[in-house]
Amino acid sequence: MRLDRYLGSRAQLSRQDVRRLVSDGRARVNGEVTRTLDREVRIFDCVELDGQVLQPGKVARYLMLHKPPGCVSATRDAAHRTVIDLIDEPDKDDLHIAGRLDFNTTGLMLLTNDGQWSRRLTQPTSLQGKVYLVETEDEIDPGCVEAFARGLYFRFEDLTTLPAELVLLGPRRARLTLHEGRYHQV
């Protein structure tokens, strides 16, 4: 929300009063005087007017968790243990997951209460690479490198994935970098 709108609604001031107070340097965001009416105010920002705290600013939390197999990448699930169940943190119900891993997949999970950050990280338009260390039972065919580079066609979804980078690390190990999250793409 813009600072002028926030102050108008929170302090019940007219637009004219808000403009005057802000231009006089009487508003602070995160301890710094701001004279910018259209400055974005987030739930994590501390907002003051004339030295009075209107919003203390919530602490943004970013957690890394190693997801074990047999655990669901979800905040709630009636049938299975979730990654949130693994955390012993206050206010863990405020957290959500940035990304997902399949039920029996292990790896790094990122959790946060900062929705804007997690959207930037996980939206397909960001093309943020997700790196997987893959171990297989059978040897990996070297032709898979080119197949991932072209993109894989999934008949059940009738789509071709974005190109991905597969680097062979051994006969049964590879590093795979994906730029989208398709079900069972790994």
Regions found by a protein language model. Name each.
Residues M1-Q185:
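Basic, flexible Lys/Arg- and Gly-enriched helix-loop patches that mediate nucleic-acid binding at interfaces
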